[in-house]
Amino acid sequence: MVTKVVDLRSDTVTKPSEAMRAAMAAAEVDDDVLGADPTAQRFEAEMARIMGKEAALFVPSGTMGNLVSVLAHCDTRGSEVILGDNSHIHIYENGGISTLGGVHPRTVPNNPDGTMDIHKIVAAIRHPDGAMYYPTTRLICLENTHGNTGGKCLSVEYTDKVGEVGKSHGLKLHIDGARIFNASVALGVPVHRLVRAADSVSVCLSKGLGAPVGSVIVGSNAFIDKAKILRKTLGGGMRQVGILCAAAYLAVRDTVGKLADDHRKAKVLAVDLASVETNMVFFDIADPRITPDKLCQVLEQRNVLAMPASSKSVRLVTHYQISDSDVQYTLTCIEKAVEEILSGNAKFERLTNGTTTNSYGH
């Protein structure tokens, strides 16, 4: 008998549904590097339509999607991108924009709601007269939802204002929209409207949407033409990629409608309901006798997987394969785990499911 494991480490842990597996097996495929895979072409066209952009491109990962997007906009070494100091691109993507693209990150503090102050963005834009001394600002990056602030949503109004700032200074705007559909559902705003101001958007298919692999980037035809070359340069060109796109199509079609339920379950897990906007719950641990590492170890012994978010906090992420009974079981296990640790009866050992490592942007 297989023991049920409640896996709340991330929404990246979902397993392909039977429908996805069947679609992958039946997918009509050809060589996508040659531009001939019909399933990939149909999926990319559908994603461009949904996102309100001219074209789309499937890429193996969100990290590659963001990297390709930044390099497409900043195609001259010595370019500079303005982005949040607590953003996924800046913290969790191996510094790829600088190590591979020669693009300098100019950070602006992220507020607790994931935004950056508009006036600080403007102040970070390099003046052309300083070209002898400074990099050239070419791009602004936003993240929606914002992972490190607990899945906070950036509003249409805010995004539009940043877009206006960019246009007035001749800059492009890229949105790291790994969980953009979560933001769309939480805000009640169509996703195409949410990203209207952006010149490019990356969308993760394997987080909240539940596909097994991949991300998609969207933008103008000219942007996607450049992105295709960069994807190949970075080793992201794949052959019969329609197998993956078939699963991704079902993820977009079938899972977006379930995201509101994920958000509801996250609120059940939360102590402070106002702090939860989407599917991510962060909770701080005040008692010094309980560390995130210890708590996650004891939870794993009860078949609940969570992940430390920092030295004092734990993160739980709901997804469509978490049931209401899973949520209630988790709450019970957290209560019992705390009691066990405080009583001195807990046993600690290094476990194997990644629960004792930082979330690292998952």
Predicted regions: what they are:
Residues 2-322, 326, 330-362:
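Conserved PLP-enzyme active-site core in the AAT-like
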